[in-house]
Amino acid sequence: MYNSNLLVIQKLLSTNAYLGHRIPTSDFQGYLYGFRNEMAIIDLEKTLICLRRTCNLIGSIISAKGHLLLVNTNPEYNKIIQQMAKKTNQSYINHKWIGGFLTNWKHMKKVKKHFQDFSAHPNLKDAFTSSPFDYFPRFKKMQKCFEGIMTHNIPDCLVIINANQNSMAILEANQLQIPIVALVDSNIPNRLHKLITYPVPVNDDSIKFVYLFCNLITKTVILSKRSQRPKVKVKRL
């Protein structure tokens, strides 16, 4: 077990997952290994523990036929998130969070249906030489919002790649007691950290780690689908 842990930590080291910011927030202190050249160093053993907890949670949700919503606002990670969602058949949002997306879910379902009816209109493509959404700003905004949503049901878990930029998503999920998995860097505000049920302490600016993390979640989802059982209500922590 020790050798296995060591190999994983070496892999994490290669992604620069341990590099924090100069001034970590007080709630993040428990995840620190120390400081080097005035930079916070994240304890990767604790990162590994959090990754295992995350995989256990996601595995149990998928096994119970639950659904994930992947949330990201960093354009650098867009393709990674899209590929992950496609491989796992989960939902994703790769743009700024729309207020009320979760807390006003019934309304959002109606808006989504309106968008789908509009985009599926048989004469729509023939009427425009370019994308019809270019002529309808409202529907172009809807396209960004709904293009990655694969379910009509409210998600069973949020997986957030950049927590600092998604405070509204965190607040809404917390209000509805939806479990939140989030990559948290050393500058995560205390008020947000308290709301995240499954934080993963890490350098969230590392594209190598984000790729590694998404690959891990993808494998967890695929393996868990093989042992799916009738859906049950997942206990909210």
Curated annotation (Swiss-Prot):
Which key words are in the record?
Mitochondrion, Ribonucleoprotein, Ribosomal protein
One GO molecular-function entry? structural constituent of ribosome
Ribonucleoprotein is among the record's keywords: yes
Name the coiled-coil region(s): none
GO CC annotation terms, alphabetical: mitochondrion; small ribosomal subunit
Return the PROSITE patterns for the record.
RIBOSOMAL_S2_1 (PS00962), RIBOSOMAL_S2_2 (PS00963)
Q: Which family does it belong to?
A: Belongs to the universal ribosomal protein uS2 family.
Protein name per its UniProtKB record: Small ribosomal subunit protein uS2m
Q: Where in the cell is the protein located?
A: Mitochondrion
Pfam families on file: Ribosomal_S2
Q: Which processes are annotated in GO (biological process)?
A: translation
Chain's gene name: RPS2
* Species annotation: Marchantia polymorpha
Q: Which domain of life is it from?
A: Eukaryota
Q: Does the keyword Ribonucleoprotein apply?
A: yes
